[in-house]
Amino acid sequence: MSAQVPAQAPNASAAPAIVRTACPGGGAHDTCGFLRVPLDRRLPDGRKIRIYFELRSRADRSRPPASTVLSVEGGPGFSTTADRSARIQLWRPLSARRDLLLVDLRGTGRSDPLDCTAFRRHILGYIDRAARCAAELGTARDFYDTSQSVQDLAAVLGALRVGRVDLYGDSYGSYAAQAFALRYPHKLRSLVLDGTYQLPGSDPALADLAASTRSGLRLACGRRPGCPAGREDPVKVVAGLVARVRRDPIVGTAPDGDGTPTHVRLDEDALVQVMMSGFYDQAVWRDIFAAARSAKAGDTRPLLRLAAETVTTDGPNGDPRLYSESLYLAVICHDYPELWSPSTPVAQRPAEVRAALAAYPAGTFAPFSAAAWTGTDFEGALACLRWPSPARTDPPAPPGAAYPRVPTLILNGDLDNITPLADATVVAHRFPRSTLVDVENSGHVTALLDQNDCASVIYLHFVSTLSPGDTSCASRTPEVRVVPAFARSAAAVPPARAGRRDRSTILDRRVASTAAQTVADALQRWWVNYDGTGVGLRGGRWSYSGGNLMTFVFHRDSFVPGVAVSGTARWVYTTGRVRANLVVRAGGVLEHLRMRWSLQVRAAMADIDGHADGRPLHAHMLAP
């Protein structure tokens, strides 16, 4: 039976009640539950919706909390509490004196998630499905916006009698956090924006994302010795691929992130989706240059695999309690700027879009066309083309509100091409007491699940002291391990360098180098794998298990034709340490190898020891 605890909430005609529920994995002093709030705050006695929260208690209960960390997830549409493990992990070093509050924004997670039938499957025709979703939601869609969500946050703080908070927002959570800061500056002790963009929104044609994609291509290639773009501009390498698939799409079957054979049609629209995925999947920056070279030479499998891992295809959609596509649309179609005027009838919007795009300078969307960049079928710039304009105006923050002098930390990866560093710079200029940290070689959101013990350490120091402290680690994060080539035989693989006691042949060391790349390829696929098993690029399979210490098991995994890798590799996520024990067969060669390298050291080397047909092998190579 649930208990009701009366508590005060701002701007309410009657004190609302918290309905308590059991806390998932909670401690004795944790509080979880729901707060009922009006759908439309102009009608406090009208329809109510539930806002779900989890208040995780500090360890030291002998005195009041030093503060409460309020963590808000992005999307829009993702559930904050579904991501509790990562947020608790980030908060843990602060947990002696500070509480942690997680809140699912309205329409997400357990806060009565929006669930349009049109989005229960991934199918083409996104704009039409969005229009059907708008009709299904009816006029209620206008009340699922950022302004209402931050007022919900304030209501939860009031109901729980929480004092000033250290607000952490990532991705869209950082957008909502800015809106909260502008509306409730007195409720903030500090503000951290991770992977951020400006209010009311970025360029409606996503031109800034195109610019950051070009920048990302150049940065990823320029920082890695042996990048296959060579002396050619990396953007031109991809531009050549764009021209090819625009003229002649590449069609075939390749494994997705879980190893499921997937039919792929790689045209310009699909390639836009591939490149837009770089913000979360480093395999895009890692593979794209070598995959483009291979496709040009007639080997399309690496490119088709990359597309199968990133391009949205037909199939069941995920649980809306984890991510609500319907809520995503309700928010962006209400809050973000568009390529058409709000007063333009739906039927006239395409003409207005064409005129707006024609005004952009040539090359704005390079290496893609304006039509492909803005018209991609999944969450593109035209997602709201047939969504009705809001019947009410409720901007994310009060018009004319001054940016507060609250201590503000802004974290952004320079390979983030969904909330670009340029946008974070604009936001930093708006907050008078802000520090912007550019985390090199990092994608979208840097402190959560931080592999490099950098952004998370800066965050913890900032919350503790209101100063970011030493931020020099942000310029030392490891480069993207760009694949030098997708070779078709071991003879085409550059050999590992022989050590002092080595008695192996050049072919032995080519095979050893191939084995190291095979392990690295599987480790990279972990980021897009959800069921613990996968397949090799050229055959065989692998699986993994574990948490911070992950064990990968290889069964004749083939990254290069003719080379089969079996054995195990262990990866410690928090330290980046990789250790492998492998049996490798390549033609008549049998190798027993031990290898080790780090994923957290820039320009790291991999050490390889073992035997090749009885010959001692001691070599090293640039860590893959």
PLM regions: where:
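Signal peptide processing junction and immediate N-terminal pro/mature segment
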Residues: 1-9
